[in-house]
């Protein structure tokens, strides 16, 4: 907490905000001063109130307090990105093995197995034969189903591991996700992941002609429908609706929706998306 107090002071002073302004009259400036110098701690409620008054976020404070280092999850993503080579899976395999070497000497074995699952998801994008071990599948299931509130970590973990799941199992996980992620849905990162997962499930269900699951995803999407500035999601959803119509015999209506979606991408200058969806449906 001493380091956090020091960082808080640096941010406050850099923005020319006094101790009194930072407390907003809700607690004494001397209390905040003692927190900044490491002489005492501050309650979470007071700390969050003061953060808001200096226009800072918890993420900024933690990033600075770690000495401009990201958290371990961000570090893992960086390690993966650094070795990622679409033509060579070996560096990812080495990273995967190293995670299990850490697992052997760690008290938090679950964390290293979940890290291994994340690494393996990138391996699967290069080699479809890659699958989770029975232990990895169990740890993934137990973690997600025992966590009562899904935040950005859980949504990301589920999203990257989805290629390992059948459509029925994916749908079961999504039912859990919907129940457990509403609390944090308005955070932009969470919302984007949430909608990406739903769209992926909707499309996968349609392509496999599992229409009961497809209509479940359609209902959940419409219950959490996209804001006006979420144009990409809206357009892909329009295209997916067209695919569903076509698969169920409403070919003319479906083709029109898919062609409309491609035209929207073209008008917005999203040429790669337009080309992808045009080629997928031969519009």
Please give the residue ranges for each predicted region:
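A short, Lys/Arg-rich alpha-helix, primarily the initiator
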Residues: 1-14
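Short alpha-helical DNA-recognition segment
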Residues: 16-33
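DNA major-groove recognition helix of helix-turn-helix/homeodomain DNA-binding modules
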Residues: 45-60
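Alpha-solenoid helical repeat architecture
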Residues: 66-77, 107-115, 149-157, 188-196, ...
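Mid-protein regulatory/catalytic core that forms ligand/cofactor-binding pockets
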Residues: 100-207
């Amino acid at each position: 907490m001493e380091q956090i107090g020091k960082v808080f002071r640096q941010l406050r002073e850099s923005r020319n905000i006094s101790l009194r302004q930072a407390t907003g009259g809700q607690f004494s400036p001397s209390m905040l001063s003692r927190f900044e110098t490491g002489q005492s701690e501050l309650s979470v409620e007071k700390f969050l109130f003061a953060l808001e008054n200096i226009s800072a976020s918890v993420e900024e404070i933690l990033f600075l307090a770690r000495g401009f280092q990201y958290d371990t999850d961000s570090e893992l993503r960086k390690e993966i990105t650094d070795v990622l080579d679409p033509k060579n899976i070996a560096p990812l395999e080495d990273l995967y093995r190293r995670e299990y070497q850490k697992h052997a000497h760690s008290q938090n074995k679950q964390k290293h197995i979940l890290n291994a699952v994340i690494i393996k998801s990138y391996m699967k994008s290069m080699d479809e034969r890659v699958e989770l071990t029975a232990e990895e599948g169990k740890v993934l299931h137990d973690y997600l189903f025992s966590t009562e509130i899904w935040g950005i970590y859980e949504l990301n973990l589920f999203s990257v591991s989805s290629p390992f799941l059948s459509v029925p199992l994916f749908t079961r996980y999504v039912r859990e996700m919907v129940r457990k992620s509403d609390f944090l849905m308005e955070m932009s990162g969470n919302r984007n992941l949430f909608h990406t997962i739903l769209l992926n499930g909707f499309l996968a269900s349609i392509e496999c002609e599992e229409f009961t699951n497809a209509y479940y995803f359609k209902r959940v999407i419409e219950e959490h429908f996209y804001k006006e500035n979420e144009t990409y999601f809206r357009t892909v959803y329009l295209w997916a609706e067209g695919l569903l119509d076509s698969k169920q015999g409403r070919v003319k209506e479906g083709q029109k929706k898919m062609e409309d979606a491609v035209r929207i991408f073209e008008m917005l200058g999203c040429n790669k998306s337009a080309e992808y969806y045009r080629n997928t449906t031969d519009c």
